[in-house]
Regions:
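Extracellular/periplasmic, surface-exposed regions of secreted and cell-surface proteins
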Residues: 1-28, 40-242
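N-terminal, polar/charged subdomain of small-to-medium soluble alpha/beta proteins
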Residues: 34-35
Length: 242
C-alpha cells in the first residue's frame, strides 16, 4: 500500500507471509529381502518427517523530497521486521510385525523427535541524499538492527554508510575531451549478518537408549557471540566516449 500524504511526502508499507511445508516418507516394506542377502531391516522400516516454516514480514517507510534552489534533498525513514517460526517433527523405526502394516505405531522399535524455534529481527533505517546542480551528490544513512537470538541482554547494533558521486561532465555542461560522460564515486559502509536462534547458547539434545533417557551435547555455544560486522570501501567510476 502507498499513500501520498502531502506534496513530496509519501508513505508506503508492505506486509507478507511466506509459508513452506515439507513432508517426507521413507518406507522399506516388510519382507523385501526375499533372497535373504539384505542385512538392513529385513522386517522392514519406516521413517516420516515434517518441517513447517513460516516467515512474516513487515516493511514500512516514508520518504520526503524537496528542492531549495540548486540544492535537492531526498530523505527516507523506514522500519523492517521479520519473524521466522520453524516447527519440525520426525519419527521412524524398524521391525513391522507383518505385511500391510505400514504405520509408525506398528514398528517394533521406534523413535520420535520434534523441534521449535522462533527468531524475530527488527531494523530501523534512515537515509538522506543531498544533490547540488545535478553534478554532485552525497548520501548518508544509518541502520539499527535488533535480533532475538541475543536474548534480553542485547540491545541494538548500528550500521552506518556514506557515499559521494561527482559528475564532471554535468558540471561543465558537456563533454570533456573525448569523454561524453564521466562519473566518479566513493562509498564507505558497514553491514552485518545475524546468527541463528541458539548459536550463542550451549544446548543439549534428548537421547534415548536401552539404558534409559539421557542428554547428548548439541550446540557448543559462545557467550561472547555478537553480530557479524563487515566494512567495505569502494572507489569507482563510469566513463563513456564520443
Amino acid at each position: 500500500a502507498s499513500y501520498k500524504l502531502a506534496d513530496g511526502l509519501n508513505l508506503s508499507g508492505t506486509f507478507g507471509m511466506n509459508t513452506t511445508l515439507n513432508k517426507s516418507t521413507n518406507l522399506t516394506p516388510f519382507g523385501y529381502a526375499v533372497d535373504g542377502k539384505m542385512g538392513y531391516a529385513p522386517q522392514g522400516a519406516l521413517s516420516k518427517g515434517k518441517n513447517d516454516r513460516k516467515v512474516y514480514t513487515m516493511d514500512v517507510k516514508g520518504d520526503y523530497a524537496k528542492n531549495f534552489g540548486d540544492i535537492s534533498t531526498e530523505s527516507v525513514v523506514g522500519f523492517q521486521a521479520f519473524q521466522t517460526i520453524t516447527k519440525n517433527m520426525s519419527g521412524g523405526g524398524q521391525q513391522f510385525p507383518g505385511p500391510g502394516l505400514q504405520v509408525l505405531g506398528a514398528l517394533g522399535s521406534n523413535s520420535a523427535g520434534s523441534g521449535f524455534s522462533e527468531v524475530i529481527e527488527a531494523g530501523l533505517m534512515m537515509q538522506t541524499r543531498v544533490g547540488y546542480m545535478d553534478w554532485l551528490y552525497a548520501t548518508a544513512g544509518i541502520r539499527q538492527d535488533a535480533n532475538s537470538a541475543f536474548g534480553a541482554d542485547f540491545s541494538t547494533i548500528t550500521y552506518p554508510r556514506f557515499n559521494v558521486s561527482f559528475i564532471p561532465t554535468a558540471m561543465t555542461g558537456g563533454a570533456i575531451g573525448p569523454m561524453s560522460t564521466l562519473r566518479l564515486r566513493m562509498a564507505w559502509g558497514q553491514a552485518g549478518q545475524q546468527p541463528g536462534a541458539f548459536d550463542q547458547y550451549t544446548t543439549f539434545l534428548p537421547w534415548a537408549s536401552e539404558f534409559g533417557p539421557g542428554l547428548s551435547p548439541g550446540n557448543v555455544g559462545d557467550p561472547s557471540l555478537k553480530p557479524e560486522v563487515s566494512t567495505e570501501i569502494e572507489f569507482g567510476g563510469e566513463v563513456a566516449f564520443l
